[in-house]
Each structure stands twice: as C-alpha cells, then as structure tokens.
Amino acid sequence: MKLLLKNINELAAKQKSEGLTAFEKERQAALRQEYLKKIRGTVQDNLHHVTIIDPLGDDVTPKKLKEIQAELRG
C-alpha cells in the first residue's frame, strides 16, 4: 500500500509541475482505482466485525450485518 501511495503521489506532483503523458494519466487512474478498491475492502472488512450496542447494553446490530457475520464465521 505504501508503494501504491508513493506512485500516486509522484504522478500527482508531476501532473502539477509539468503535466502527464497519456500513458501516465492512464497509469494514475489505474493506481487510484486500485487504491480505492483496497481502502473499500478494508473498510468493509472492519464493518463486518462491528457489533452495535445501544446505551442500555442491548445488541442492536442490524439483521443484515449479523447474517454477513454468521456467513464469515462459517
């Protein structure tokens, strides 16, 4: 992920300073899509492991999320 961000930032800096070639623009778009895919996957994975508790201490995790969690447990 660090290398991915490094490449994205290098292309962004180059775009600001001198512009990008068509190939570099395509590469930049592909890198950004890959980055977003990884971030979304991480967020989704984190949400699949969340339990929601109300102020009274009751589990109020949505049914759909509980079903996903049950599938992940096997």
From Swiss-Prot:
> Which domain of life, per UniProt?
Bacteria
Q: Where, subcellularly, is it found?
A: Cytoplasm
The keyword Electron transport is assigned to this record: no
Q: What is its main location?
A: cytoplasm
> One Gene Ontology cellular component annotation?
cytoplasm
Q: Which Pfam families match?
A: DUF896
Q: Which UniProt keywords apply?
A: Cytoplasm
Family designation: Belongs to the UPF0291 family.
According to UniProt, the name of this protein is: UPF0291 protein lmo0496
- From what organism does this protein derive? Listeria monocytogenes serovar 1/2a (strain ATCC BAA-679 / EGD-e)
- List the taxonomic lineage: Bacteria, Bacillati, Bacillota, Bacilli, Bacillales
